Amino acid sequence: MINDVKFCAILTMRYINKSLMQSCHDNIDAHMPPPPKGLIAMRSFHISPDRGMSIFYFDTNENLNAAFPSMKEFQQYVAAKFHAKADAQKAITSSQSDFGEC
């Protein structure tokens, strides 16, 4: 088991028109803001042809809370531009249930 806790932002996107996903990725690559303070890792996932998810890991809850509004704002901008529905959540990893490193 892993003993340290990570503070996370989980951002999801569902594209109304799944053919826009690659254009959206290209736009994000070109316009991604600099990494926020305390960001230690990010993992992105394709869930289905029209859905994606990214998990951002922060070192402290304070850094997550400071970064979350601007992350959400950027996500909403992208969702509006590429006809998608976005959701953002905060989470804390479970040191009791974690296993391995990714």
Can you name each region flagged by the protein language model?
Residues 1-53, 59-73, 80-102:
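Short S/T/G/P-rich N-terminal loop/turn motif that feeds into the first structured element of a domain
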